[in-house]
């Protein structure tokens, strides 16, 4: 990778959210190192296991007291005991459930390897908990507690256990909970280690969230993820410098109170004396004959951001009537577009683009022809001007696909163009668009791939998914912890792209653009989707409903830099 762009050194790095147990997303090795630090300090291994088991048993007893779970509790509990410390945690849980009056049985598929786990096993048998001589019947109604393997899983659990777990889910879905990590699932990547893995209704994650458990590939196996707080001291957590940070609902509120970058402060309401041009100037290049609605959705998202001046370069057929639905949007240019050729970027006029704070390119613009082949010369002028633009460039959808198809006269094409760009860039791909732009990274786990992409091209990357990931070139990463599958509908990404671009335009107008703003925008967008999903009927989750809901959220604060004043148009 070449020298960093000049603007990159000015990016702020104040941590948001706090790097604490509520937000850190760790790998198994990081947690093992943390445990070694705690044990070296004098904390007995026995104390941590007891603490974990007691915390899970208290939480599980509360769950089993709920109406939907009471019958499972009445039918009894089967604890699947592994050979290591995860099995020991399960035995503490089994003991406490037994002492609470529940009928608990034990089954261990492998010989016990850890002395502490063996001690808990002997004690459980002494208390009278029965050991099953054969694997439990997967069709029976008892609740299964999966304590076979936790974060240390490196290989498949074996055909016998895998088939048992598969049959359990087929015959009794929703009747298994997992301790720390479902057996057969990698806690680092979220991928299955073999042919099958436990499918949990709830996964009780001990101490810190394991990064693999919130990846898209893991969601069907993890079920509802609950972090069990173990009261870990803050000091050793500060040493986990390379962790991604999880973002939840409370973090949208805490963003407004965040101290912000040095030399500036974060404000909610805009400066009362600021003109519309000092509240962010954004150009949206979107839409085509085939995807006409994308322009409307992107502009609706941008409008919800609170940016002061919104311009559009869209198909001429849309431009003529835009005033009837979005009267505040200034039509900068009506562009030619056909069903098969997409939006004509060769005719895009960017004179005076230096006066803008941000440009969004891509939602619904289509491809140059239906076979997804590209004519490098057709868009060359637009890419040249956008490369020289010193403001924020947000690339989404077919903007990314067209970039990936350009020659750019470099051996690594699009990536070299991104590195040469004069201003900051935000990329918002879904997995397919990411694979086209970064084919060499497409098979990596999402957290690893997004960071490698950001560092290779110098852009901030928002990799969209059920739990979207935001990665900055300086190494910071965030991942959304909350999402609603009901709002995964066509057009939602257009709203997000417009909203994020508007937030970025406001920030740049105030002189304090940062990758954390893209993370905050993605979080608020996801929460708006969750909010509208509670409305009755499918219409409540339409993308325009999300955009309307975004408009009612408090504006994402923008950093104020008194030294910068933006000129008018």
Label the model's feature ranges:
Residues 116, 160, 196, 491, ...:
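Short acidic-hydrophobic sequence patches enriched in Asp/Glu that either
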């Amino acid at each position: 990778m070449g020298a960093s762009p000049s603007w990159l050194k000015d990016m702020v790095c104040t941590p948001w959210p706090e790097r604490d147990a509520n937000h850190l997303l760790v790998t198994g090795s990081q947690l093992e190192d943390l445990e070694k630090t705690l044990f070296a300090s004098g904390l007995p291994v026995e104390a941590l296991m007891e603490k974990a088991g007691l915390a899970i048993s208290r939480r599980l007893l509360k769950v089993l007291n709920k109406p939907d779970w009471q019958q499972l509790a009445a039918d009894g509990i089967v604890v699947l005991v592994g050979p290591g410390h995860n099995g020991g945690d399960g035995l503490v849980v089994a003991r406490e459930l037994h002492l609470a009056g529940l009928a608990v049985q034990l089954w261990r598929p492998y010989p016990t390897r850890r002395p502490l786990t063996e001690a808990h096993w002997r004690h459980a048998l002494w208390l009278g908990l029965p050991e099953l001589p054969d694997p439990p019947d997967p069709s029976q109604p008892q609740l299964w507690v999966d304590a076979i393997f936790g974060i240390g899983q490196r290989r498949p659990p074996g055909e016998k256990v895998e088939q048992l777990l598969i049959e359990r889910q087929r015959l009794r879905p929703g009747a298994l909970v997992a301790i720390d990590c479902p057996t057969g699932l990698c806690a680092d990547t979220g991928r299955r280690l073999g042919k099958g893995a436990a499918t949990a209704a709830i996964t009780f994650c001990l101490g810190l969230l394991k990064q693999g458990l919130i990846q898209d590939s893991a969601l069907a196996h993890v079920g509802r993820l609950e972090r069990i707080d173990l009261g870990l001291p803050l000091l050793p957590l500060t040493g986990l410098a390379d962790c991604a940070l999880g973002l939840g609902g409370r973090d949208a509120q805490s963003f407004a109170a965040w101290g912000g970058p040095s030399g500036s402060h974060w404000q909610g309401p805009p400066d009362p004396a600021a003109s519309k041009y000092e509240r962010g100037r954004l150009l949206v290049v979107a839409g085509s004959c085939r995807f006409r609605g994308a322009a409307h959705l992107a502009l609706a998202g941008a409008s919800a951001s609170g940016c002061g001046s919104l311009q559009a370069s869209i198909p001429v057929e849309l431009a003529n009537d835009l005033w009837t639905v979005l009267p505040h949007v200034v039509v900068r240019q009506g562009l030619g577009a056909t069903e098969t050729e997409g939006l004509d970027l060769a005719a895009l006029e960017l004179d005076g683009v230096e006066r803008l704070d941000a440009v969004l390119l891509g939602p619904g613009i289509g491809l140059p022809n239906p076979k997804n082949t590209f004519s490098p010369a057709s868009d060359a002028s637009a890419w040249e001007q956008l490369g020289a633009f010193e403001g924020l460039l947000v690339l989404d959808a077919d903007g990314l696909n067209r970039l990936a198809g350009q020659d750019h006269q470099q051996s690594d094409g699009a990536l070299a163009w991104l590195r040469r760009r004069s201003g900051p860039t935000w990329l918002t791909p879904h997995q397919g668009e990411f694979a086209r732009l970064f084919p060499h990274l497409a098979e990596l786990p999402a957290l690893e791939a997004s960071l490698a992409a950001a560092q290779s091209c110098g852009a901030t990357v928002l990799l969209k998914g059920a739990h979207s990931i935001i990665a900055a070139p300086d190494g910071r990463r965030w991942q959304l912890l909350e999402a609603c599958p009901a709002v995964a509908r066509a057009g939602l990404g257009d709203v997000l792209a417009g909203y994020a671009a508007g937030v970025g335009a406001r920030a740049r107008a105030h002189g304090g653009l940062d990758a954390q703003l893209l993370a905050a925008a993605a979080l608020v967008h996801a929460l708006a989707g969750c909010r509208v999903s509670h409305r009755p009927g499918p219409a409540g989750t339409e993308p325009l409903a999300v955009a309307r809901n975004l408009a009612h959220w408090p504006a994402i604060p923008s950093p104020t830099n008194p030294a910068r004043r933006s000129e008018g148009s």
